[in-house]
Amino acid sequence: FDGQIRALKETFGMQEGEVDMTTLPIFALFNPALGITTVMPEINPSTPAKASARSLVETLLDFEVTTTFASPVIGRKIANWCEQRNLRLPVMKRFFLAGAPSPPALIEKLASFMDNGNVFVPYGATEALPVSYCSHTEVADTREGIERGEGSCLGQPLPGVSVKLFPVSSSPFGKEIQEVKDGEVGEICVAGPTVTEEYYRMPGATFDSKFLYESKTYHRMGDLGYFDAKRTLRFLGRKVERLNTPQGFLETERCEAIVNSVHGVRRSALIGLGTKDPVEPCVIIEPEQEFRTPKAINVIEQEVLSRLSVRLPGFKITQTRIESSLPVDPRHNAKIHRLALAKKWSER
């Protein structure tokens, strides 16, 4: 906790006297230690997707909020409301977007309403937060690559945080473990002052997720990624959601960012059809509300398959499905339940 407080002060410049709009109550715990006022919007934290966009923006403006942490679904509501009403967020210093990968277009759109602030995309987990971060300007610089399937931008590790990549494995790491070579995909593992040492009274979970390397205790994030040519950490998806296809392994972020860049797509999910490896890759598409006619859906599906064939030529992706709403986690209403979708469509 002390490491997290230091990171919020030293890295993000959070200061006493600021005002935070808290959309996830647990993050309000930081505010008393920072000397920051907490404002709670009219929101049910268990269903942020149902929050009123008007209420959220009015809270930001009425209480002169300087900082907030929200999931992409909240960020989208705020950005759309500001756009529709031609509103600005003049005193906002920082808008943290986290909980699931945020489309570059959303990040840039939010930033356009903040005259004196930044949109930050922090990376971390309950066991390690924050690990790294990037700003909206970095996302803009890498947007073209992201939408080509090069992975989400996670930025640079925070001072004092060590990020290593190790070969993908479902087994606990032993003493002989070695890092992957530069540019190779591996499991993201982290150590530092913002990383927990163990699970309380859960030795089995600690054994599976923690290991010693170069005299430091590292935590396995369960995420896949790589360092690009600029040593920027890139995110490719969850390890358990990587597909073993006839053409090789395919990570979710290499595919979904391409699909999400198609006009009319709200979000998407890469799943595998079948119960045994190798599985057939299939893209589940959730269209925007105004693109749900049979004609519009057909255009979207054809464009999705066309882009995938160009940008992922090594993979054969010919299957698409349409869902009116993708199943998501209850906490952020943003993490897509891909394994549940795979089970549903594999049984049909």
What is each stretch, according to the model?
Residues K9, D20-M21, I36, T67-F69, ...:
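Gly/Ser/Thr-rich phosphate-binding loop
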Residues D2-V19, L24-T66, W81:
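Conserved AMP-binding/adenylation subdomain of ANL enzymes
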Residues V195, S209-K210, T232-N260, I284-K295, ...:
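Adenylate-forming
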Residues E150-P157, E179, S215-K216:
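Short Gly/Pro-enriched turn/cap motifs at secondary-structure boundaries
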Residues P172, Q178-P246:
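Conserved ATP-binding/catalytic segment of the ANL
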Residues L110, G225, I258-N260, L308-S309:
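Hydrophobic C-terminal alpha-helix "anchor/cap" residues
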Residues A269-G274, C282-V283, L305-R348:
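Conserved C-terminal "lid"/linker of ANL adenylate-forming enzymes
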Residues K175-E176, G222-L224, S261-E288, K316-Q319:
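C-terminal boundary motif of the adenylate-forming
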